Amino acid sequence: MAATRPIILRFESRNGQFRLSVSPQELFPTLKQKILENLPKDVEPSSITLSNKPIGTGGEERSLDGLEGVSIEQVGLKHGDKLFVGYQERKGGETTPAKAHAAADSLRRLNGALVPQTETVTFRPPTSSSATVKNPWEVVQQSPLDDKLDKKDGKIQRPRDMKMCKHGPKGMCDYCMPLEPYDPKYLAEKKIKHLSFHSYMRKINAATNKAELKSSFMPPLSEPYYRVRHDCPSGHPPWPEGICTKCQPSAISLQPQEFRMVDHVEFSSPDLINSLLDFWRKSGSQRLGFLYGTYEEYTEVPLGVKAVVQAIYEPPQVDEVDGVTLHEWPNEKEVDEVARLCGLEKVGVIFTDLLDAGRGDGSVVCKRHIDSYYLSSLEIAFASRLQAQYPKTTKWSRTGRFGSNFVTCVLSGDEEGAITISSYQASVSAVEMVRADIVEPSAEPSVMLVQSEDDDSDNKSRYIPEVFYRKINEYGVSAQQNAKPSFPVEFLLVTLTHGFPTESNPLFTKSTFPIENREVIGESQDLRSVAKKLVSHRDSNEVIPEVSDFHLLCYLHSLSTFSKTNANRLHSKITRTVTTNLMTPQDEEKLLCRVATSHDPTEGLKLINTPGWATLVTILQESGERPPKRPWLNPADPPRPLSQQGKRHLSSRPESPKSESEQLAKRFKGASLE
C-alpha cells in the first residue's frame, strides 16, 4: 500500500508555481487537465512541455502529449520533486472578463499605483539582448584595426634620464622603464582628458585577469543593462505583472566616463566643411549630413583611434533657422553600398547650429560655452540612438559588443565669433539610458530629465531605477544627489579632438557635382549636371579624374546604368584585345568606385570601355546632352596624330554639324525627358 500513497509534485512556469497531488502509477497525459487549471486560459494545450530545468536553459524538455504510456514512477520522480512547465499562448485567443479584471488588479507600478484598466500594456522585450556570448574571444570577429591594436605592446617608451638613471645605456630602472598606456601621470602631462578604448580595456583587464591568480580568462568588458530582464529564472510573471531582485536593474550612479571609443575626428579636406556651410550661407537654415570615412590608428594618443572623414552625404530633411527635421531616407542602403565599394563606412553625423551676429563681417553668435551647454539634451538623445544603431563588436566583451565608434560633430560659433567644429560622443551609460527609456530631453538644453513611472504618454508601464550623480555642494564637498527630476548633461558626454591633415590628400578629388537634396536653394542633380561634368570633356584622360566624386557615384548608382554582374563585353575588336590583356571580367560598378578612389588611368581606361559607360553616354546623348563637336580642321593645318591604341572618344558615333536651332530643340527635348 505504501507504493500507492500519493506524492506531491511541484510545478513552476513563467506564470507562477503550483503543486499537484498525484499517484506514482499515474500517466503523464492524465495530468494535462490539472496543469491547465493552474495556467492562463489562453494556453494552447498541445504546446505544454515539461523539463527538469527551467525552460530554455538546456534541460531535457519533453512534450506532455509525447509522454503517452509513461508513468511518473518510471522517470524516477519522488515526493517533493520539481518540474518546469513551458507553454505557448493560443493565437487570437480572447481573455474572459473575469480574467481581464484580475489581471488589471495585479498590474501595479513600483510606487503602488494601479495601472488603469483602460491602459494597454504594449511593452515588448528590446531587440538588443543582454545574453552573453560563449568564448567571445574565439567567435567574435573584430575590425582589422582592433586586431592590429590588440597585437601592439602599447607601452610608452621613455628615454634614459641623465640625472636619475645610474645604469648603462642597455640597463633600465624605474625612471626610464616603459609606462603603461593608461598611466595617469603621462596622461596629465600630455593633457589627455580621456583614455583611449584599448588603453581602458587593458587597464580593466589587468585588474580582472590577474596572472598570479592563474584563473580562467574572463572578458573584462561588460555593457551596462538598465532594463528589466525578461528571461528571469525565478518563475514569476514577466514585468509589469511581477518583478524580483534578479531581474530588476540596480540603481544607476552616474559619473563622467573616463574613456572614449574614438579619440580624434580628421576631415580629409576643408572643402567638406565649406560645402556644408554653403547651404547655411545661401539659405540661413541649418543643415545635417552623415559622415562617411574610415577608422585608423591615431598615434598622438596611446593606442588611439581616429575617424577619417572622406565624404558627407545630406539625407532628405526639412531645414529651419533653429533646427533640422529628418525625413525618411529611402536610399540609405544604396548609399551605404556605394560607400562600401569605395572602402568607406558611416562613421558619424554632423550638423550646423549657426546664427549670424549681424555685424556684416561673417561672425556668428556663440551659443555653446561653459556657462550654457556644449551638446543639448535633445542632441545627446539623438546621438545615443545613432550610436545604438551602430554598435562596436569586440572580443573583450561578454556580449560580443561594447559601445560604438559613431561620432557627432557640431558646426557652431566660438567665443570669438568664428565658426568652429566640436566633436562628441554619448557615453555608454547615456546610450543604455536612452535605450531603456529612462531619460528624455528637456526644454532646457543643459539638463536631462528622468522619466516618471506615472507618465502614461507612451501608453506603457516603465521600470525607472534610482539614478544618482555626484557634485560639489555649497560646502565644497562631493555629495551624492538624486537625479530626479533632472541632472546636468555633462555626465552623458565625452569630448573628442578634431582637425585637418597637414598635407591634404582627400579620397575624392573632384567634388564639384551638385549635392543631393538641395532643391530648396535651387541646386539639383540631373542628367544635365552629369553631362556637364563628364561628357563635356573630349579626352578620356580628362574624364577619368572627374568620376572621383562621392555625390556623382551615388547619383550614377541610382541610374542603374552599370551592371552588377560579372560579364563585361566590349564593342570593338581593339578594345576587346586590350581588355583581355589588362583585366578579367568584374563588376562594373565596383570598377567605377575603384577608379574614383585610386585615380588610376589604367583602371579608367577599362571603365570607359565597359557597356555600362557606353549606356551612360547613350542616355546623355538621347536626353539632349551631347558632347561638343570636334573643330573643323583647316586644310593648311598639319594632320593631328592618332590617339593611343585602346582610347576612344566618349561619343559612340560621329556627329555632324547641326544648326543652333536644332541644338536648342535637342536641349528642350532633354529637359522634357527629365
Swiss-Prot record:
It is found in: Cytoplasm, Perinuclear region; Endoplasmic reticulum membrane; Nucleus membrane. One of its GO terms (biological process) is protein transport. Residues 623-674 are annotated as: Disordered. Keywords: Cytoplasm, Endoplasmic reticulum, Membrane, mRNA transport, Nucleus, Protein transport, Translocation, Transport. One of its GO terms (molecular function) is ubiquitin protein ligase binding. The keyword Nucleotide-binding does not apply. GO terms for cellular component: endoplasmic reticulum membrane; nuclear membrane; perinuclear region of cytoplasm. Signal peptide: none annotated. Residues 655-665 have a biased composition (Basic and acidic residues). The keyword Protein transport applies. Pfam families: NPL4 (PF05021), zf-NPL4 (PF05020). Residues 265-402 form the MPN domain. It is a peripheral membrane protein. Involved in the import of nuclear-targeted proteins into the nucleus and the export of poly(A) RNA out of the nucleus. Has a role in the endoplasmic reticulum-associated degradation (ERAD) pathway. Belongs to the NPL4 family. This is Nuclear protein localization protein 4. The gene is npl4.
